[in-house]
Amino acid sequence: MEITAKQFPYNTGVVSRKAFDDHITLYDGYVNKTNEVTHVLATQPEYATANATAGHYRGWKKGETYAINGVILHELYFQNLGSEAGPMGAKTQNLINRHFGGTDKWKEDFIACATSARGWCVLAYEQRTATCRNILLDSHEDGNIATAYPIIVLDMYEHAYFTDYGTDKAAYINRFISSIPWVLIEKRVSVL
């Protein structure tokens, strides 16, 4: 099944228009690569040579999770780039209070997680233990928790912030947090 890229408006004070447009180009590449991987696996899987060390099938299957997670994580991230943060919703506030002991403690942990991440920082609800966690992904497919439901997604790859913030990760992270669209986050939390 072929996927198509979603359209995201530029409405953010977190990154410049140039950085946003460059980022959309990278996202479009993940969409295209997902479609290519899907096609190759459907038409040329080479099942007979599959093995755990290396090979055609293994390479394409590894690429499959990398590409589709690249699509999904970027879509969630672009949705998180809100220009009007507004107040945090009651359900979100209750969830953060219950699992982190308050907004300030969550924010401190989220900042530390994002600062430590090479790829992504995700506030996620992990279903197995019924716990909210800030999780760190060093790449699209490295660090995911299988039953985690993403609530807030922050791209920490250098391409996401370097154009506008250089090496000042803290400024990027703090600007992102101050711009979280809490109405959207409340919708995500309401399904839990």
Region annotations inferred by a language model:
Residues 1-192:
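Feature for soluble, non-membrane regions of globular proteins
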